[in-house]
Amino acid sequence: MTTTTNIINNGVSSFSLNNNSNIPTIHSPSNPIVDCIRDGTMAYIYLVDESYIQQQHQPNPKFPSLIPLPKKLYSTTPNKTTPYPFQFQQNNENLSIVKEIYNYINCFEIKDCRDFHCVDSIKRYARFHLNLTLKFMGCKSIHARQISNTVFEQLEKCRIEQNKQLTATNNNAIVTTDSITKTEQSTTTTTTTTTTTTTTTATTTTQPPIYCVSIQRNIFYYIIGHILSCYQYSKPQYIIDFPVSCEVQDKKHSFTILLGGTSGCGKSTLTALLASRIGFTAVISTDNIRQLLRKFISRQESPILWASTYHAGEIISNPSLSHKEKILQGYEAQNEMIFNKLDILIGHYEKRKESLIVEGVHLDTKLILRLVKKHPSCIPFLMYISNEAKHKERFAIRSKYMTLDPHQNKYTKYFKNIRIINDHLCHGADEHMIPQIDNTSIDRSLATIHGTIFACLKRKVQCGESYYNHETDKMNMLYNQYEQIQHQFWSSKGMLRLIQKKKTVSPHGNNNVTGDVDNNNSNSNNNNVNNNNGDNNGDSNVDNNSNDNDNNNNNSNNISNINNDNDNNNNDNDNSNVDNNNDNSDNSVNSNNSINSNNGNEGSNNCNVVNGNNSNSDILIKVEYNKNNNSSSNDNEYKNSNDNHCNIKNETENSDINGCINNNIISYNNNIKNNTDNTTGNHNYTTMNGNNENDCKNNNNNNNIKTIPNEGQQQPQQQPQQQPPQQSQQQPQLQQKKQQIQEEQQNLNNNNKSIEDDEEAFNSDDEHDHEDDSIRGNESGSVGDHGNSVKKSSLNDKNHNNGNNQSNEDNDDDSDISDSDSDGGERIDYYLDCGSLGS
């Protein structure tokens, strides 16, 4: 900083800046002095208003022109529908190829320019000023710098091309005559040699010229709009926003930002970043004003001034007041002492049309309203932290010993008083519609404030609206713009819901029978489920995903596939989707699903099934295996819906089992007892699962069990539906079914011992290898457009010995131990099950 100041004070020329080897750090692309003064290139752009050019184009102007003006004038009509005199090529930033542009620009050296600061119709822009203007209108920092450099480079090309045209014109105008004698030619040659030597020596000592260009303001806006479109800023709003940003840069309009809030809510950090982002360095804190007042007022004269805002109420000795009333009364008393000086400061900045940022805890709602009524350029915001725990953690950084101990951290000691002031400010902001920003994400808060400021300023410039409504005593226009900007910046949870909605695929009902199998492992089973209902045919989609199988094929592929024929006129569940996901295991799951609903009178089973007046239901069955307990947890969730869909989801993870699902009954390494009632033809399936016993009966339902060939073999075609046979004709079939079920039961019993041995070997493995696969977050989302919902319960934690599910509740604030000012402000562990939600 001292080097730059010495350069300015000592009057070092731009030529010495570029050629002096003693100052290697000055000549850098990031130095603002080098950006403003570049020898031999385009350094400044002079923007001239249309009215000034019209005055100078008159026959007898009153005042001589301060700068060289363009040859032609682009006159606009009041309705601003006049087309531009030339057109640019789309996505081509080269301006020199447009020949008509040379009539509306004029390049000259800086020595030909007079003092123009006395005229408001002429403004000068360097690269640095144009960069700030683009950043204020909303361009990214890197794009703003690239666009500003591109504008100056293209105008430099136009200057070079214009000089070439002038040189060619002058060469054509020179007429050489043959009447010159040889003696005259010899004398001219001798004089030219001497003059050339003197000129060469002179050029080595003189400085290179600094070039400038004068351009009409409307033409300049047109050029900037074309360059912006080349950098993907092609929306019409950017072309409209740039003139507003230029008016603020030219000090035709100004604003004062007021950032209030309690201690520790991030006001100072946000103010510094905001000033750097919008390019305005005038920042004042109310704490600095209080510190200046302390230099002139002693502690004995005003003890409240020397106290902090959160314990100024301790000085008030009124026993009739409560603790909360004392805190607020002392806080407001100190604010009154700051108001007078702050009012005078804002008034001086408004007179000079300069923008200012004021932040501090003393900006309560009453003081803000008084400033807004007196100074229309004020734009207030209230910063707060909704989560008390996160608010308290911030004070550990500000403490001298980096601790939250109340004996060593004064902020923690008076934290209750700070929260009392925070609630008081939020209540006043709600009453007067002052925008409140939960500063848990510094990036989102910064973008929201910047967008709101520019949107309000644009409405004030274009429409003349005021931020404050004197009739309602509220900040109506400011709050409306804040709400619009707030919806544009999505939170991470909102974006998560959008991703879930796009990823999920709703199952659509068809009138034919389909069996879809997706196998991702050679050791997994090939499961085909075929459902034939008496009234309608349904869809059966089976997705079997097996990953990271650590066991042999002996533990799987032992259970045959079952074809379920349900002949029941009261069965309205036409569509059945079965999703079986097997992770880190070799599992064989047979699904035999039949659901009967007698118009809501009684259910088909007694496994916590809720049937309403509609026979449709969404069923989620999730099988979980706790590795530490060597047991399974069965979570059955049933939900009614209005669609003819039945969604059944079965997930088995971190297990090595053979499970069988028959009529919504989950069999886990247990024997199946089958009791057949020959008189009625109904089957009663009883499953023993640990200490739990689930009995499910199918009334007036005849189940035909058939074997379906494995994948690779040709499946039989669907037979046309027939009427159910008489009871007497079904007795041999029932006996055959019973025999088949007994054979399958015997196979299960034979494999039971080998499975238990594999389970013991599996449980002895290191739990660290599967730690990442057992801990996942809970997730919920809407599926499809048919009203079907898919519910997921979280996996059991391996480090716990119970089978209870864990769920993570979404909070608006940070739930991690990371800093709340990090990017995004929220950390969400998000997993999508591609097998269940579709591709």
UniProtKB/Swiss-Prot annotation:
Location of the region described as Disordered in the Swiss-Prot/TrEMBL record: 504-611, 627-646, 682-839
InterPro entries: P-loop_NTPase (IPR027417)
Comp. bias (Basic and acidic residues): 636-646, 765-776
Coiled coil: 726-764
Keywords assigned: Coiled coil
Bias type Acidic residues, positions: 809-823
Protein name, as recorded: Uncharacterized protein DDB_G0273453/DDB_G0273565
Naturally occurring in which organism (per UniProt): Dictyostelium discoideum
